[in-house]
């Protein structure tokens, strides 16, 4: 299931936005977008970092392997944006499961830049 289908289609029509929709494996024979791992697709498409932001949303392992590629492509840490909601459990800062150093993903995020993440303890 693809969420925000209309919004993604509208972005894809713009000249100033490049959208790469990707799944690991396509179960639908009519799937017309990228198939493969996001780090691989990122290397293959080699998006320009000039005046651009990279927005990364997915499982932690995908984020982990995509961030270094974006850095190699020249994206500065303040323009790499990621969603870390998979770390949340209670959603109100009580359980402590989502804390990264002094930050709580549920209260201070879940969207962070790589610049912000680089200031947290390395255990994440």
Regions found by a protein language model. Name each.
Residues 61, 85-110:
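Local cysteine-cluster metal-coordination motifs and their immediate loop/turn environment
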Residues 1-89:
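FNR/FR-type flavoprotein reductase catalytic core
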Residues 70, 103-105, 121:
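Generic secondary-structure boundary signal with a strong preference for alpha-helix termini
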Residues 96, 116-124:
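Short Fe-S-cluster ligation motifs
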Residues 70-72, 114, 123:
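Ferredoxin-type iron-sulfur electron-transfer modules in oxidoreductases and energy-metabolism complexes
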Residues 110-116:
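Charge-dense, low-complexity polyampholytic segments
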């Amino acid at each position: 299931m693809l969420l925000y289908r209309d919004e993604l289609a509208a972005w894809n029509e713009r000249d100033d936005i490049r959208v790469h929709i990707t799944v690991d494996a396509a179960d639908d024979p009519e799937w017309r977008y990228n198939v493969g791992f996001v780090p691989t697709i990122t290397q293959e498409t080699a998006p320009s970092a000039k005046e651009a932001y990279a927005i990364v949303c997915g499982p932690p392992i995908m984020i982990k392997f995509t961030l270094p590629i974006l850095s190699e492509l020249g994206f500065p840490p303040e323009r790499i944006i990621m969603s870390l909601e998979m770390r949340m459990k209670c959603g109100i800062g009580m359980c402590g499961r989502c804390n990264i150093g002094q930050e709580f993903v549920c209260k201070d995020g879940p969207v962070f830049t790589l610049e912000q993440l680089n200031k947290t303890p390395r255990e994440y």
